[in-house]
């Protein structure tokens, strides 16, 4: 694999990983919200409830960070994938596939921006 193709593969894998990070951030947020509510419903110690709220806050802070990283990685991949050296390669096909997925994730998050409370 040439260095240029290797670079495309690396940047594609970065985008792929960050998409997973965004998905995991949503899962972590949902689970943390459930834990907080469960602690409240069970009348547990206020210190434990506050700790779980702190954990939830950290998960909420992770999502915008992942989205910024995804936007940056998407821009990097987009700029490198326009190189004519990659035309017709399976690596470019995969890069384009993940670019599309990344743009969908970013668009979905922007659409939810006013109501999701994460920004």
UniProtKB/Swiss-Prot annotation:
Mind listing the GO biological process terms from this record? post-chaperonin tubulin folding pathway; protein folding; tubulin complex assembly
Q: Does the keyword Ligase apply?
A: no
User: Where does the record place it?
Assistant: Cytoplasm, Cytoskeleton
Superkingdom of origin organism: Eukaryota
Question: Which GO cellular component does the record give, naming just one?
Answer: microtubule
Q: Could you tell me the keywords of this UniProt record?
A: Chaperone, Cytoplasm, Cytoskeleton, Microtubule
Named from the GO MF annotations, one term is: tubulin binding
Q: State the oligomer form and interacting partners.
A: Supercomplex made of cofactors A to E. Cofactors A and D function by capturing and stabilizing tubulin in a quasi-native conformation. Cofactor E binds to the cofactor D-tubulin complex; interaction with cofactor C then causes the release of tubulin polypeptides that are committed to the native state.
Family of this protein: Belongs to the TBCA family.
Name the job this protein performs: Required for the maintenance of microtubule structures and cell polarity. Beta-tubulin-folding protein; may have a regulatory role in the tubulin-folding pathway.
This chain's protein is named: Tubulin-specific chaperone A
Organism expressing this protein natively: Schizosaccharomyces pombe (strain 972 / ATCC 24843)
């Amino acid at each position: 694999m040439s260095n240029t193709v290797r670079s495309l593969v690396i940047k594609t894998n970065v985008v792929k990983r960050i998409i997973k990070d965004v998905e995991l951030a949503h899962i972590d947020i949902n689970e943390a919200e459930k834990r907080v509510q469960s602690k409240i419903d069970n009348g547990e110690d206020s210190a434990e409830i506050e700790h779980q709220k702190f954990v939830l806050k950290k998960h909420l802070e992770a999502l915008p960070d992942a989205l910024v990283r995804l936007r940056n990685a998407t821009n990097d991949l987009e700029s490198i994938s326009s190189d004519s050296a990659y035309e017709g390669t399976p690596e470019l096909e995969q890069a384009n596939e993940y670019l599309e997925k990344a743009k969908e994730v970013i668009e979905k998050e922007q659409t939810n921006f006013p109501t999701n409370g994460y920004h």
